[in-house]
Regions:
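A solvent-exposed interaction/effector surface
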Residues: 1-212
């Protein structure tokens, strides 16, 4: 059986529909940075997706190729994720100003993937898929203390979920802790091409710290 991060790490990928506090461990990602409305056809976000999946599946399928990755185990490619921010002192997201989005779009990689393995995957994917993978990077993220919640419904309805998260954060004696390294985080458990908007499931996660 292939290792499924969603099933084995339910605290990270299957939170309740009510907010909760969690300490997220360090993780590795294949990532692409960009700007702009994620819904724009041919935009930076849309162009990032085949690059991310190209690397993730190259690593997964390495078992059938010439590269032997130390510590390799078969795995289900984890869900697409995104770190989002706008130029705002508060760190709040304005869902109307989609053109002002900055993003890091990413897919989690197993811990066995080293820099050499990643560089091999980039070269292998470039040769086989005939795409320009120069924008991808191996990203290490240590999110640490966060509040998170399962959001069900359209992405544009997330402010209600974020409001509940903010209220819970305050009640528990914490405050938001957005910075140039800590962002609004979304994990996409549903494929919007195949799922009705009202049934979309998205993990929403925000960095927090103890109130002083």
């Amino acid at each position: 059986m292939a290792f499924d991060f969603k099933k084995e790490c339910k605290e990270l990928y299957r939170p309740a529909s009510k907010p909760s506090i969690i300490t997220v461990p360090p993780m590795s990602y294949v990532a692409v940075r960009g700007k702009g409305d994620p819904n724009t056809e041919g935009g930076e976000y849309q162009n990032a997706l085949p690059l991310l999946y190209g690397i993730a599946y190259t690593v997964k399928m390495s078992k059938k190729g010439s590269r032997s990755i130390e510590g390799y185990f078969d795995f289900v490619v984890p869900p697409l994720e995104g770190f989002w921010w706008q130029e705002s002192p508060s760190g709040d997201i304005d869902y109307v100003r989609k053109d002002d989005f900055n993003f890091i779009s990413c897919i989690r990689l197993p811990d066995f993937v080293t820099r050499d393995d990643f560089d091999w995957a980039v070269a292998e994917a470039t040769a086989k898929k005939k795409l320009d993978f120069s924008a991808v990077e191996l990203l290490k993220v240590d999110e640490g203390l966060c509040v998170q919640c399962m959001h069900t419904g359209p992405y544009d309805n997330e402010p209600a979920t974020v409001g509940a998260m903010n209220e819970y954060t305050t009640e528990q004696g914490y405050v938001p802790d957005f910075s140039d390294t800590r962002f609004h985080h979304e994990i996409y458990l549903s494929d919007p091409r195949k799922c009705a908007p009202e049934k979309l499931k998205t993990v929403v996660r925000h960095p927090i710290k103890r109130a002083e």
